[in-house]
Amino acid sequence: MFWRKTDKERLIGLLEWFLSHDWEFRKSDYENLKVLNTLLLRFDIEPVWVNFSIWDCFYLKEVERERLLEAYKKLKDEQ
């Protein structure tokens, strides 16, 4: 039997993906980032701001990473 993931389950999965990412962005990652930001806004969480380098790598400020980690923990606890 198949069932569709809820928005909360999708958001948790995308946060796990994003927080464990290898810092090199591929074309498919841009779509995931877009969906992640859409779901974050749906749950009244500020979207992710990513800084890109000229080599298609990105970095995340520590404050931003901590904020996302707190949001992830809160969502996991509510699940």
Describe the function of each predicted region:
Residues 1-9, 65, 70-79:
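Short intrinsically disordered terminal tails
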Residues 20-69, 73:
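Acidic, low-complexity, intrinsically disordered interaction modules
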